[in-house]
């Protein structure tokens, strides 16, 4: 997890609010602006970028799925609010039950709740049950929701012990009969289109969940390029008299890696701009082909960035495998 002082500084500087609408105290960031912010952070530290990515993303998605008056109460009365949630189900089947006062009780343990240590609220997924049977919606399907629970209604279970992204704090979150207050039961994390003009609020949810993850990957690749450049200029390989930077193979691979990074970044930005252009023209959703291109660009960018880090780590030789090497950290984070 991130140290408390780092999270506090990030909150103070508005990193968890920049994607919110201006009327809710944010900067109303576009998808391209979001990518740039997260990429910059990711070049420094991927776990910091990932925490900001999840916190700012869920803050912004939640505001689109709640009544604007309730949103003012949550976001403007507490400028330091940070949200988390949306992970997978744990080993115990989750459930939620309506209460007589209109609230909902929730039981369950969700996995991969990145940034939970920083959060004021958590969205916990569970089906709405009545006895042993699921409640059905108007479409005849079981009702499954992400229930919005305040911090005192859930606990963190320390399960995050991994190779890469170690600082993301993606532990489990558990609740045993936690209360989702009646005024929060109408909040829908996945509403589109939402109440706000920013095209981001009319993007299909799978795309909205994709481009900012790719931004973190871009940051890792960018940081790897910077780290390798420093290594190449200062490392003199065994049995050599000049630095690694003088070797043609190092120059070739550095050029190859930079071309991979810059080309996948450019395509991602191009496709996200095309999505926003369509939405600015008044469409409720982007066209199928535009969405397909953007989703493909997101996946392509993430995969190419992993290859960039692999290539540079390999070219750095034994220097890259040392635990003190920034390339070693980039390798684990990229994967």
Can you describe what each PLM-predicted range is?
Residues 219, 255-262, 295, 299-306, ...:
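Generic structural signal for well-ordered, non-transmembrane alpha-helical segments
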Residues 316-335:
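Glycine-rich phosphate/cofactor-binding loops in nucleotide/flavin-utilizing enzymes
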Residues 10, 221, 264:
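Residue-level signal for inorganic ion chemistry
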Residues 263-300, 313-316, 321:
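C-terminal helix-coil-helix/basic helical segment that borders enzyme active sites and/or dimer interfaces
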Residues 4-12, 17-119, 134-135, 141:
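Glycine-rich flavin
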Residues 109-153, 317:
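DPxDG-like acidic metal-binding loop motif
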Residues 87-90, 107, 126, 149-162:
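Active-site glycine-rich loop that binds ribose-phosphate moieties when present
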Residues 163-261:
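Glycine-rich beta->alpha junctions and the first turn(s) of the following alpha-helix
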């Amino acid at each position: 997890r991130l140290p408390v002082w780092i999270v506090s500084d990030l909150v103070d500087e508005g990193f968890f609010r920049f994607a919110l609408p201006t009327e809710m105290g944010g900067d109303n960031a576009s998808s391209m602006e979001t990518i740039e912010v997260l990429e910059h952070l990711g070049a420094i530290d991927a776990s910091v970028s990932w925490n900001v990515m999840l916190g700012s993303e869920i803050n912004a998605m939640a505001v689109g799925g709640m009544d604007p008056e309730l949103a003012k109460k949550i976001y403007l009365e507490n400028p330091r609010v940070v949200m988390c949630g949306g992970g997978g189900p744990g080993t115990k089947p989750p459930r939620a039950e309506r209460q007589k006062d209109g609230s909902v009780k929730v039981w369950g343990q969700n996995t991969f709740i990145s940034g939970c240590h920083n959060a004021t609220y958590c969205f916990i997924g569970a089906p709405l049950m009545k006895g042993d049977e699921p409640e059905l919606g108007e479409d005849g399907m079981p009702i499954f929701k992400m229930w919005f629970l305040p911090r005192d209604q859930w606990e963190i279970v320390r399960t995050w012990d991994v190779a890469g992204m170690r600082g993301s704090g993606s532990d489990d979150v558990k609740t045993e009969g936690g209360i989702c207050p009646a005024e929060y039961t109408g909040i829908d994390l996945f509403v589109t289109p939402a109440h706000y003009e920013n095209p981001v609020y009319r993007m299909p949810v799978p795309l909205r969940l994709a481009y900012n993850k790719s931004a973190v990957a871009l940051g890792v690749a960018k940081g790897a390029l910077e780290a390798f450049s420093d290594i190449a200029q200062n490392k003199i390989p065994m049995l050599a008299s000049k630095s690694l930077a003088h070797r043609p193979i190092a120059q070739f691979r550095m050029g190859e890696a930079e071309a991979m990074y810059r080309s996948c970044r450019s395509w991602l930005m191009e496709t996200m701009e095309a999505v926003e252009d369509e939405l600015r023209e008044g469409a409720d959703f982007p066209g199928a082909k535009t969405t397909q291109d953007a989703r493909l660009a997101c996946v392509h960018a993430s995969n190419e960035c992993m290859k960039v880090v692999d290539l540079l780590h390999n070219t750095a030789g034994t220097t890259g495998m040392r635990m003190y090497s920034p390339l070693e950290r980039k390798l684990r984070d990229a994967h």
